A protein has these predicted regions:
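Sec-dependent N-terminal signal peptides
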Residues: 2-13
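Transmembrane beta-barrel domains of Gram-negative outer membranes and organellar outer membranes
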Residues: 16-163, 167-172, 188-271
Length: 271
């Protein structure tokens, strides 16, 4: 038995598997990576409170990928499972410019999948000192990217180092009176051919902080509190077509000794 564990440990420690295409996302932010033509990826994200977000992404050509996802809360556990929405969310990625030695890749995209549960909450709006009305807020705990553009550049520095920066605008989760343009950036550092370190920051400028000053009932919805979201992760290429990722999210917001943890499993294949 000890020999079996030793063999497994050595295999895991020294396995060197290259993934056939660059990362499509970091922990959550999009990159300029797309799927090769004739390739699909099935992704499963396991989130807090037994949540699960399965996603299917297909490469129509080397620069154009489309996909859809569907969020479920309480999928694991004893509570009744509930879907975030009745219809699936969509993803579209189109890389306009390829990366060169001197210039980054440039991609435009659309992603309607937010993070966490989908919140539908009636909150009071103070019209004047004597009257108020109810407004229904409809948004994810962390808003979807919506329309976005992203630049990605890679360097070979004792393994690949990729840097990604982008802007996004969510035009459909705006009932919190905040449709500001948002900024995000991050990096991925290859530790060896099997393991990569991920680090990212979502400024969450569109998180509804201006509206929060007007509405007392919006406190638990504006989860960013104006600080944005800092996330980190470790990605393991178990095989050429299989990735597992352990992520630590919102580490700048959590006052506890432990972070919000997620597991992401990605399987890719040709068709």
């Amino acid at each position: 038995m000890k020999n079996i564990f030793l063999i497994i440990f050595i295999t895991v420690s020294f396995s060197q598997v290259n993934h056939p295409y660059p990362p499509l996302d970091l922990v959550s932010i999009p990159t300029s990576g797309t799927l090769p033509k004739g390739t699909f990826t099935i992704e499963t994200l396991l989130t807090k409170n037994g949540g699960m977000v399965p996603k299917l992404l297909v490469g129509l050509n080397d620069n154009f990928s489309i996909g859809m996802s569907f969020g479920i809360q309480n999928f694991i556990g004893e509570n009744k499972p509930e879907s975030n929405k009745q219809t699936p969310e969509v993803q579209v990625k189109y890389r306009i410019f390829e990366e060169t030695v001197s210039a980054p890749a440039f991609l435009v995209g659309l992603d309607t999948q937010g993070f966490g549960p989908f919140i539908e909450k009636a909150v009071p709006i103070n019209i004047d000192d004597s009257s108020s009305s109810l407004e229904t807020i409809e948004r994810y705990e962390q808003k979807a990217w919506g329309l976005y553009v992203v630049l990605s550049k890679n360097w070979n520095m004792l393994g690949n180092l990729g840097f990604h920066i982008g802007l996004n605008k969510n035009t459909f989760e705006v009932k919190d009176n905040d449709s500001d343009l948002n900024l995000f950036f991050g990096l991925d550092k290859e530790l060896n051919r099997s393991f990569s370190l991920l680090l990212e920051y979502n400024a969450a400028i569109n998180d509804g902080n201006e509206y929060k000053r007007e509405l007392d009932g919006l406190g638990e919805i504006t989860v960013g509190k104006g600080l944005g979201f800092l996330n980190a992760g470790l990605r393991w290429n178990i095989a050429q077509n299989l990735l597992i990722e352990v992520n630590f999210k919102d580490i700048n917001l959590d006052a506890d000794d432990f972070a919000n943890r997620e597991i992401k499993i990605m399987y890719s294949e040709k068709f």
